[in-house]
Amino acid sequence: MRLKGIFKEKSSTGKLGILFLLMVVSVILHTLLAQAVIVLFTDITLIAVSMMQFTSQSEIDAVKFIQMLSAIGLFITPTLLYAYLCDFDLKLILNFNRQSLLLAIAIMLLINPFIAFIYEWNMSFNIPDWMLVYDDNAEKITNSFLKMNTLGDLFFNLLVIAIIPAIGEELLFRGYLQQNISQWTGKPHVAIIITAILFSAIHMQFQGFLPRFALGIVLGYLFYWSGSLWLPIIAHLLNNAMAVTFSYPTFSDYAYLTENTATWQQAFFSFMAVGLLVFLLQKNLSIKKD
């Protein structure tokens, strides 16, 4: 039986339901697989992992492993299966020129003061305590993950925190959602905004909602202008990889480059510099299309 494109003629609502079902089933199976591996091949109990006491490096690594497979199960596997079953074009292999890639990288390097300023503003909001529980748990996990002693820890973190999320989240949010919302509404800019909202909301970190939303807007326009997922994937990867790399003791002197603090003057110049780079990027891509 030929499965490729079997759901191609389904309605947009039906296809969305198929993707949601694939995501639920996939993340459950991947999480169960990760837990089974831990139980069978380590001395760590799932109770210890679920309590998140992080009393040893092995427990931290176990949580990283579960998070890695869960992320693959939530973002990568279902989106690729959906693309196969619905014959959906993810636009993953379209070419882009070197200048566009360099401009996208420069944007991510220069945008941090502006994002940091938004983060501080978001932190000033009066957020209910029940919401802050999610932020506290996320901060606890992140701080535990970023305690690295060896190059092996650094490379594992780059895989779990940078590479897999960059590929998986961009496949789902820009590769699928943004394209489909744009088709449904006929308004690509609205699609970018809605996708950025969903992108930020799924992380369940309310004190970081606005900066992640702003990042989602940038990633959305990188995809919209270039027509290739590789630009937002590389930009997303760079953003996460800098935070991981500068937390490693050898590179900790550069941690200020990713700090969540910035003056309004720094934010202003960051915004203006990024605006100029965005203009150059759009112009560069327009010339390429012509």
Task: Name the predicted role of every residue range.
Residues 30-85, 98-106, 130-131:
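Alpha-helical transmembrane segments in multi-pass membrane proteins
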Residues 48-55, 91-164:
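Juxtamembrane helix-loop-helix connectors linking adjacent transmembrane helices
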Residues 59-74, 140-164, 264-273:
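Hydrophobic alpha-helical transmembrane segments
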Residues 168-194, 221-228:
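Membrane-interface helix/loop boundary segments of multi-pass membrane proteins
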